[in-house]
Regions:
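Sec-dependent signal peptide recognition
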Residues: 5-12
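N-terminal signal peptide c-region/cleavage motif recognized by signal peptidases
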Residues: 16-18
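Extracytoplasmic small-molecule ligand-binding "clamshell" domains
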Residues: 24-97, 101, 137, 160-161
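Periplasmic-binding protein-like
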Residues: 33-36, 111-116, 191-227
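Ligand-binding cleft/hinge of the Venus flytrap
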Residues: 42, 57-66, 107, 129-132, ...
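Extended ligand-binding regions for polar small-molecule ligands
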Residues: 54-63, 123-137, 141-142, 209-232
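Acidic, polar ligand-binding/catalytic clefts
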Residues: 69-130, 143, 197-203
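Short helices/loops that flank or line small-molecule/ion binding pockets
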Residues: 71-72, 76-88, 164-184, 192
């Protein structure tokens, strides 16, 4: 009898603790991201979000009874906000040592991406030496060593743009020879352009995650639901 009572008490405690750990009842969690198609697409005119990562956020809202409000910020602003503890969470976010000091990351990624190379001259996509070329990249995104070393890409030759859209403008104006960015995102931005060619780098993968301000949610419950979502 004592064992049954003890199990019942532990069950009640676990349920209560889980609900409290997720978020205060009815509290809105403000979650920041940036325009990152096709995973997160922000329509400025309609002020709405679509994309595969948004579908995951909607699933978490429904399955866990959360109220996550998605907020769009430019990437440069997103980087600054991570250390200020003003917002509750961020998504489509890669990990690094600095970010992990301020945020709790899920173990399961929202998606895994690869880098891509974009150019006006298709014949240059398979070059092996980029040491004398001009390359545009999104500011704040690190180029993996596996790619930089193999293709002799030098930091001094990289022009950092404030957005992926700006990178493509630089390419179209021939101010750079190449763009390196997320392959799928680059294809999305290039779809309305004429004469832009692409190839995918297979030397490195980039998983991205949802990250929460410490203490806002039970990160294990979030992880469990993300895993379940992708196993459906």
């Amino acid at each position: 009898m004592d064992l049954i009572v003890m199990r019942f008490i532990l069950l009640i405690f676990a349920l209560v603790a889980s609900s409290l750990a997720l978020a205060e009842s009815g509290k809105t969690l403000r979650c920041v991201t940036t325009h990152y198609p096709p995973y997160t697409i922000f329509d400025e005119q309609k002020n709405i979000f679509t994309g595969s990562d948004i579908e995951l956020i909607n699933y978490l809202n429904q399955s866990l009874g959360l109220n996550i409000k998605v907020i769009h910020l430019p990437w440069a602003r997103v980087k600054k906000e991570m250390t200020l503890n003003y917002y509750d969470c961020y998504f489509s976010l890669a990990t690094n040592t600095l970010r992990e000091k301020h945020l709790e990351f899920t173990q399961h990624p929202t998606h895994v991406t690869k880098f891509g190379l974009f150019a006006l001259d298709k014949s240059t996509l398979n070059n092996k030496d980029f040491s004398s070329t001009r390359i545009a990249m999104l500011r704040g995104v690190a180029l993996p060593n596996e790619i930089a070393d193999k293709y002799k890409i030098l930091p001094k030759n990289i022009m950092h743009a404030l957005s992926t859209s700006d990178s493509f403008k630089l390419l179209e104006k021939k101010r750079v020879d190449f763009i390196i960015t997320n392959y799928q995102a680059g294809l999305w931005f290039a779809k309305n352009s004429v004469g832009i060619h692409a190839r995918q780098f297979n030397e490195s993968s980039l998983p991205v995650y949802i990250a929460f301000k410490p203490g806002v949610v039970d990160i294990n419950l979030i992880d469990k639901q993300i895993k379940q979502y992708y196993e459906q």
